[in-house]
Amino acid sequence: MDTRDIHVLKYFSSFVSVSCGQVINITEPTLRFCPLAKHLYKDFSNIRGNDKETIKSAIKSAIESKIKDYGFFTDSRKLSCSDVSIPYGASEMLMSALKKGAIDAAVVVCEGAGTIITDVPEVVQGIGARMNSLLLTSPIKGIIKKLKTAGCRVVSENALIDQLRGVKEAIEAGYKKIGVTVCGHSAESLKMLRSLEKEYGVSIVCLAICTTGITKDKINMIRDCADLVWSCASSDLRRTIGPLAILQLSRQIPVFVLTKKGMDFISAYADESELIKSLDMKKQYLFSNEPSGQCVHLGSFEAFISESKLPVNGRKEPSFEDKNEYASV
């Protein structure tokens, strides 16, 4: 292991360490099932019960496929993409919002570079389409060079992850409508982002992502300050935030839209944007792939919108071995 090249991410409830393009450590997983992981990576279909070694092997295989196919954690990183990988991904929505002018910059995190600012839709998707919860990273010169060549601003040459600083620099660069991703474990920064928004008179769309295993106080911070939140494998988040949402996207791994600003952001992702904007903010709605209600088009996928009390549970939701998601913190 090169201690100057270390990256730590969270995937399937395990902390995964990568150095020099190699997976070097995976902690014990507590999650036993995730419908998205099973859909994206065939090795998760081989898991039976709580076979942790099989789960760890599947986690390693998934991360190694990102390294092999897309150059993750290496100078060979592919950083531009326009394909819509999943129906309700944060990067997919940010890409669409940039294309349609709903935001004029995105503040996101890239391994090897940390927090970056970009107004290039394809770069947002290239970075985020297959990214998991990145908690720590170190500089990779090839990635930083590619990002700068693509017109991105790298906030720290040391590859620090600092979304608050990223938004400040985006404001200083003249951007007025900014979308920012915030990892659930850093939920305390959401309140400070709202203060920035008020202080500078800009619009900041806050996307709370990677929420598996976060504590109840962080869930409450997200409830109070985020515009959209990805529930991941957090059942507590579903129970706490779901009843307060205006819109739920998907049943199995819900994305909750909490504000009018969030609804306007989502409308940029839909072909039927005026329909989304016209929805009654005092009611609750569900987007799902079950043919009930009006058909709408999100990215390259179809969904159906219907009025519904939230949250709506799915038949196959993420599950933990001992029903204690906080064991994964």
Predicted regions and their residues:
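Conserved mixed alpha/beta catalytic, RNA-binding, or beta-rich assembly cores of soluble enzyme
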Residues: 1-329
